[in-house]
Design a protein with these regions (language model features):
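Structured, solvent-exposed acidic/aromatic patches
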Residues: 1-155, 193-201, 206
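C-terminal functional modules
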Residues: 148-255
């Protein structure tokens, strides 16, 4: 594809998006607000996941204000809802977690230039494929810069130079579902001395962050690579009767 005369998506102007909907509007917005009770102001029973907020908080990621609503927990601007738990009462507890920052008219992205850049980075850095001119680091950095541009935030240079930031530990402000283990020790800045596995984790983690709201793509990458590293479902939160592994999560959808 990269050698085709047609080429691939390389700029945000060419992103594949849906911008016109029916009367209900953006379908992700509809899903987020499904079963929205009057006393749950951040949207039904859907909230931003603790995993991605732990990564982005640890990385001091400026895209947070574009992705999430601020939480109602004192002293915690962004705090996510852990997946695979027994849902607490929405009116008194659940409503306090960060929600999804989306409107009824927000466009739905199907594929973006950032994803293409990360695909090139993985192909070159992990598998050694010929991606034309450019090294894995070039494509990786480009993916992050394109994502920052897509979401209208500055600070990509500072973000790319961060060699120490790591995902924060998850301390549930409700004191119910904290996770004491480190999610990952992967940092942001590219490391030419990294192993292929470390390169892949770094690329997929940033691709996952950049592909916010592209859930099918994130799920496909997670099943394919095991990245990003996520929190397991809690023992009482896994209601699959042993069908779904709490560590791995769902691998397929039954028909």
């Amino acid at each position: 594809a990269v050698n085709s005369e047609v080429g691939v998506i390389t700029s945000n102007a060419d992103n594949a998006r849906l911008t016109s909907f029916g009367a209900d509007g953006n379908p992700i917005y509809v899903a987020v607000n499904y079963n929205k009770p009057a006393d749950c102001i951040t949207g039904g029973d859907t909230h931003a996941a603790a995993d991605i907020i732990c990564y982005m908080n640890g990385y001091s990621d400026p895209r947070r204000e574009k992705y999430f609503t601020q939480s109602e927990w004192p002293g915690q601007t962004y705090v996510g809802f852990r997946r695979g738990i027994v849902i607490p009462p929405l009116a008194s507890v659940g409503r306090k977690y960060s929600g999804v920052n989306i409107s009824i008219s927000s466009p739905v992205t199907w594929m973006n230039a950032a994803e293409v850049a990360f695909l090139k980075a993985e192909a070159k850095g992990v598998f050694g494929f010929n991606m034309g001119s450019g090294e894995a680091k070039d494509f990786y950095d480009e993916g992050i810069r394109l994502s920052f541009e897509e979401w209208g935030v500055s600070g990509a240079d500072t973000y790319l130079a961060n060699t120490t930031g790591k995902p924060q530990l998850y301390a549930d402000p409700a004191n119910s579902n904290s996770y004491a283990q480190e999610l990952s020790d992967i940092t942001i800045a590219w490391d030419e001395g990294a192993t292929p596995a470390q390169m892949q984790e770094r690329i997929i983690t940033q691709k996952w962050i950049a592909n916010w709201q592209l859930g099918n793509e994130a799920w496909a990458d997670y099943r394919r690579t095991g990245y990003p590293r996520l929190m397991p479902a809690t023992e009482d939160g896994n209601k699959s009767l042993g069908v779904v592994d709490s560590e791995l999560g769902a691998r397929r959808m039954p028909y």
